A protein has these predicted regions:
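Alpha-helical scaffold segments that flank or form the walls of functional sites
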Residues: 3-11, 17-73, 101-121
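Active-site beta-loop-alpha junctions enriched in small/polar residues
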Residues: 7-9, 53-54, 79-83, 131, ...
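Glycine-rich phosphate-binding "P-loop"
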Residues: 17-28, 128-134, 157-162
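Active-site core of metal-dependent hydrolases
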Residues: 26, 152-227
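Acidic (Asp/Glu)-rich catalytic clusters
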Residues: 38-42, 63-71, 112-121, 148-151, ...
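Short, electropositive alpha-helical surface patch
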Residues: 58-73, 135-138, 171-183
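Active-site gating/metal-coordination segments in enzymes
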Residues: 65-69, 73-75, 79-156, 207, ...
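Short acidic/histidine-rich active-site segments
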Residues: 210-212, 242-248
Length: 248
């Protein structure tokens, strides 16, 4: 059993600057992760895909440590978050001097096939993200670069849709640029209860991922878990059960 979209650690971009009031406590993080990972093991889960982006607290050493402690397969990601909440300014600056799509392509391909920096740890999946109701030009650059990497290496792609929007557009851009639809999981689609919208996404042959169970209702401005389950049931009745993924 595999969970396709989880976060053992996560920090919104910029958290690294708050070492005074919000320092990282690794021992506390280990204890908290041991609690929920122990619960997963009771249900015979063996593999966890950690979808934390490069600039949002991704920590290959921590993931490797938790994999060893819990005797689980934990897969690390490579990629960036959606533009308003990420570190895109770095790439915007670099775009004045270089072909950033190619640089992003090389970065992700290297982290998948050689390793992340000098850690000796490889990523196993690409993680992309788009904004609420729009895909910005720089977000599209990342999608195109990931499609190129997938075409060459076969490594899978998982995505973040903000509030369940732009899923079909993500699938279109990725597949039009050569990505294999069977290796694409479009995430957070549980934020949308429009059955026709889900069918539009599924028409591309990609996976439709419902991965935010427990984060529901007015506090998170999302559908309830019951509404999400109703959507899954409706899609299964239409024959899409082989394209539906579920995670936390």
């Amino acid at each position: 059993k595999t969970l396709m979209h989880e976060h053992l650690l996560y920090g919104f971009c910029g958290f690294q600057g708050d070492d005074t009031l919000g320092p990282f406590d690794e021992l506390e993080a280990i204890r908290e992760n041991m609690k929920w990972l122990s619960g997963l093991k009771k249900y015979e889960f063996k593999t966890i895909v950690d979808a934390t982006n490069n600039e949002c607290g991704r920590d290959p050493f921590f993931l490797a440590k938790m994999a060893t402690i819990m005797d689980l397969n934990i897969i690390c990601s490579t990629g960036y978050y959606y533009e308003p909440a990420s570190a895109y300014m770095y790439w915007k600056f670099r775009s004045g001097f270089a072909d950033v799509e190619t640089e992003i392509y090389e970065m992700m391909k290297t982290e998948l096939t050689v390793g992340i920096g000098k850690t000796g740890i490889k990523a196993g999946v690409m993680k992309l993200a788009t904004s609420n109701g729009v895909i910005t030009p720089f977000e599209e650059i990342f999608l195109k670069a990931a499609a190129r990497v997938n075409k060459v290496t076969g490594y899978p792609i998982i995505t973040h849709t903000e509030m369940g929007t732009m899923g079909p557009d993500q699938a279109r851009i990725l597949t039009e640029n050569g990505a294999d639809p069977k290796s694409i999981s479009v995430g957070h689609m549980c934020g949308n209860t429009d059955i026709a919208y889900h069918e539009e996404l599924l028409s591309y042959g990609v996976f439709d991922c419902f991965d935010r169970f427990g984060l529901e209702g007015d506090l998170f401005h999302t559908p309830t878990d019951e509404e999400r389950c109703d959507v899954i049931a409706a899609l299964m009745k239409k024959g899409y059960e082989d394209q539906i993924l579920m995670s936390h």
